[in-house]
Swiss-Prot record:
Keywords: Amino-acid biosynthesis, Aromatic amino acid biosynthesis, ATP-binding, Cytoplasm, Kinase, Magnesium, Metal-binding, Nucleotide-binding, Transferase. Substrate binds at D36, R60, G82, R140. Pathway: Metabolic intermediate biosynthesis; chorismate biosynthesis; chorismate from D-erythrose 4-phosphate and phosphoenolpyruvate: step 5/7. The gene is aroK. Binds 1 Mg(2+) ion per subunit. InterPro entries: P-loop_NTPase (IPR027417), Shikimate/glucono_kinase (IPR031322), Shikimate_kinase/TSH1 (IPR000623), Shikimate_kinase_CS (IPR023000). GO terms for biological process: amino acid biosynthetic process; aromatic amino acid family biosynthetic process; chorismate biosynthetic process. This is Shikimate kinase 1.
């Protein structure tokens, strides 16, 4: 990979976007960004607080702006928030400005990976987590698929193995 293309990771919560993104950036010697962490850095508050105070719509507005700015950079790996694809503008920008990698996972893996994580505002509701994740998958999976240049299942694989798969796929294209 002579020229460093932007790599944008999309997928549901618990797919491993942040962990795999860090690994990928390290292996490729690229700068890593996480859109949720960038929102937290800019607001001085965690994502849950932003959701509570501004609602999902306010959070999504911030997310769209952050992703727009970050995707204008060159040679980065960006882990996006699971719901960022709800915005048509964001989907268009991701598609136009880099390679989109959809990290796919099962509901079971999502449950296992997110069960103790209190920083998941969409899971801090009265509905059972499985029902929430199934509803989100039904809404968002087609959007991930729509913009994905590459799809990789992350179940039962280490971040390093998935990062290597992504690198191999990018080098062969």
């Amino acid at each position: 990979m002579a020229e460093k293309r932007n790599i944008f990771l999309v997928g549901p919560m618990g797919a491993g976007k942040s962990t795999i993104g860090r690994q990928l950036a390290q292996q490729l010697n690229m700068e890593f960004f996480d859109s949720d962490q960038e929102i937290e850095r800019r607001t001085g508050a965690d994502v849950g607080w932003v959701f509570d105070v501004e609602g999902e719509e306010g959070f999504r507005d911030r997310e769209e702006k952050v992703i727009n700015e970050l995707t204008e950079k060159q040679g980065i790996v960006l882990a996006t928030g699971g719901g960022s694809v709800k915005s048509r503008e964001t989907r268009n920008r991701l598609s136009a400005r880099g390679v989109v990698v959809y990290l796919e996972t099962t509901i079971e893996k999502q449950l296992a990976r997110t069960q103790r994580d209190k920083k998941r505002p969409l899971l801090q509701v009265d509905s059972p987590p499985r029902e929430v994740l199934e509803a989100l998958a039904k809404e968002r999976n087609p959007l991930y698929e729509e913009i994905a240049d590459v799809t990789i299942r992350t179940d039962d694989q280490s971040a390093k193995v998935v990062a290597n798969q992504i690198i191999n796929m990018l080098e062969s294209n």
